[in-house]
Amino acid sequence: MSTSPAGPWPAPAARGPLEATVALPGSKSLTARALLLAAVAEGPTTLAGVLRSRDTDLMEAALTALGARFEQLDGEAARLRARPAPLPLRVEAGPDGVGHVDVGLAGTVMRFVPPLAALADAPVVFDGDEAARARPLGPLLDALAELGAEVACLGEPGRLPVRVGPGDGALMRPADPAHPGRPHRVSVDASGSSQFLSALLLAAPLLPGGLAVTAVGRVPSLPHVAMTVAALRERGIAVDEPEEPVGPDAGCGGGRTWTVRPGRPAGGR
């Protein structure tokens, strides 16, 4: 059976000048970062201008699976009250003692949330749409394993599904017990995606002493890394940018009200 293709869509035409005020939704990229940072802040946070989409709904669900709580305010889907999860993050585990997160096709969920699972009280299995299984994840997983997290690929190496857990809890201890202020250190090949670098930066404030990250290779989408750094700084988190490593100081900003600004579509990076 065959069907003929649909004809052109008859777009409506105005009969005269239009005057209106349009409230633009927040940027998907900024919404993802705002949700994550609110989920691990030092106190409750109010978010305004939140973009509602499948990707951001999946991010909210993933963070809820790690202990954060989100409440819609005033009946507005774009306004949320976030209550952060304490460390170690409390996984909503099943009978097998493992949590499960559906990343869908959201690159921000599949890359930003696994570092948080390394700071949780139980392992988490990440999986998503069939197309998501074709997207690279290996460099981030390698970096997490280097930092001491438990990492296991349950299918093709460097691809979803993967299990990430705290291992022996190395990331929740100082990198150098004799010098508690010294940061953890790691290198990541971010040439395949700037999200690998952003993922580590977003988790960095939660590590005792912070994290110094060295990006290996040419990083694409540098504006999205700058977006991540700006989001951290706006919340009072110190970020140093020397020639090589990039490392936020430990300590996540306290809760307050944040408005997610509109932005141009950028693939949810």
Residue ranges and their predicted role:
Residues 1-269:
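Structural preference for solvent-exposed beta-strand-turn elements
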